[in-house]
Amino acid sequence: MCGLVGIFAGNSAPWARRALLEPMLARLQHRGPDAWGTWVGSGVALGHVRLSIVDLVAGHQPFLRDDCVLVYNGEVYNHIELRAELEALGEHFQTRSDTEVVLVALRRFGSQALARFNGQFALLFWNARTRTLTAARDRYGVRPLYHLEHQGAVYFASETKAFDAIPNYRRAICPEGLLEHGLLWNTLGTRTVFKGIQSLEAGTAVVFGATESPKTYRYHQLGEGTPHPLPGSFAEAKVQLRSMLANAVRLRLRSDVPVGNYLSGGIDSSVTTLLTDELRTDRFQAFAIAFEDGAYDESHYQQMMAKRLNVDLVSIRITDALIRDNFEKAVWHAERPLFRTAPIPLLLLAEVVRAAGIRVVLTGEAADEILWGYDAFKELKLLRFWAKFPNSKLRPQLIRTLYPHLAHYRDGRQFGLMRMFYEGFLGSYDNDLVGLNLRVHNNKILLNYLPRDCRPADLDGWLLDRVRQSLPPDWQQWSLLRKNQFLEMRTLLQGYLLSSQADRMSLAHGVEGRYPFLDHELLEWLFQLPDQFKLPLLSQKHLLRETFRANLPSEIVDRPKQPYQAPDLKAFFEGGRLGKLMNERLSPDAVAAAGLFDAAAVERFRGKFARGMPPQVGYRDNMLASFLLSTQVVAAQLQQPWTGPVRPSSPRTVDLIEEGKP
């Protein structure tokens, strides 16, 4: 992966625009530590920091050809097939890079080329003939792209921190964005947690012209216009899943640098590592996270799978102190409040990967969303059962079956709370947004910490209107579980997991994550399968488990799902007492200075733990600890001056000014 920046329609002198690109890129150097370059044209300027993966010699950016310029963050995995298609149409190529294929395809087909790309990317494409700048993002929002209008120009960047280099500008937290992010774990549409900064939506392109208003094109929407369910048997679906997933892995192994795998110990990464092993002829490395705290540790299963495949397993052992000491660094890279500490071990793992000489890793990300592995899918079925059979004696057993990894639900008092929770939703179990409502219900505890003037009078109506604006036209034709998949992908996956835990943490150390389960052909096919193939009764990821049952250890195939988590509130205690980081960032003075939370409410929360760590901490307190602390860290970091370099320190491979040359 890489990092990109751009300036459009600025009225400054060319040399001034070139000078501004440099400090913007310096703030993104971690995304592309190998090389950097800039190009300045008439009314437009583009910059790029490169993580070299394909065509290491000739793939430098900005890439220029035929009056077109491209800066591009990501990969198009089917570039070999696209190259052959374009050559058959009479096109010729000067390099082996996928970057040139993307540029030629965009020049020839315009925005329609985006639907031909199988990959994860964000890009800025300047066409001098039409004098238009196209900004585009991949189907599922794997790679970020932001834009900001300021003093007559539009600025673009892979991360918002690059905008802090703009004269007379400083990022500030948007209260509405913070509220929406807190309730949904994401902001919807183009909104971000920062005032004035917009995120390009996944699956869209925006075309900026010198004399016209920007035009937005949506080239992809999950499930839109897709007939379902597909005909065919479960046995046929297993064969097809294996074939399509193997092809997704094959495409994502294309690289001119070494490729490794993440191995968590769950079935998702075990499958991608298995298929990698089948497709490769050489021995490769797998990387894993082990925890000092046995409640989170899955190293037994990681070692089992590594031994089964005879791969080299490299592990990092995570302690509470490592989480605590690296929390602020993770927040700086994430650029948003965190709801848990899970990103920090991934940040540290990426450092180990880079030190091992690996720049690309395949992971099992997104399998839970597309194959229905989350508890949320089972919760919907449980709600339906409770509504239909209100007097069933199976209710207690169903709750314990639903949450086997949460030991405290075995306690009678906790079960009573769970029963009240579910009964409170019985009247709306058939509401098409009930899955999202469950998450919002859990997160409304955050409202106790926000000033009252930050909340809309009709909060539920405001939020539901925001959600419904993002729904596809044929939404009502989908099953309830398909609707929940869409909502999970648009909120939790796209806005949080792919950003805070994936893109930002891996690229903090110049490591590109690739996600076979997000292959769009695979995902669209799975979306059309009958619901019972993916979740019969309460059997999560049933199709995936049965497809690979013969190839994986039964202990991995049949083990209850253990969500990837890390110690949250517990990690911020030192010597049995609440530690320095929490006490300083959540002090009354610090909270008042940031002006985002009710200082008295935050002080009551901190006071709950003044005497030490309680024996049990629930979901809400863990979530609150991470959210309150990380929001305060974001606010503090926004006030800190940049002390890094004024330009990237790697070799400059492109430096062109095509307007006002001296």
Predicted regions and their residues:
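Cysteine-centered catalytic environments shared across enzyme families
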Residues: M1-E335, L346, R549-A550, E555, ...
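Adenosyl-5′-phosphate
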Residues: M1-G3, E22-P23, A88, A165, ...
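Generic recognition of stable, solvent-exposed alpha-helical segments in well-folded globular domains
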Residues: A19, E236, Q240, M244, ...
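Short catalytic/ligand-binding loop motif for oxyanion handling, primarily in non-cytosolic enzymes
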Residues: I80, T132-T134, R143-P144, D164, ...
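Short aromatic-enriched loop/helix-cap "lid" or pocket-rim segments at secondary-structure transitions
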Residues: S299-H300, F327-E328, W372-F377, A571
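Short secondary-structure boundary/capping segments
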Residues: A330-W332, D375-L382, T643-V646
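Acceptor-substrate binding/catalytic loop of class I
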Residues: L338-R340
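Active-site adenylate/phosphate-handling loop in enzymes that bind or generate adenylated species
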Residues: L348-R410, S499-L522
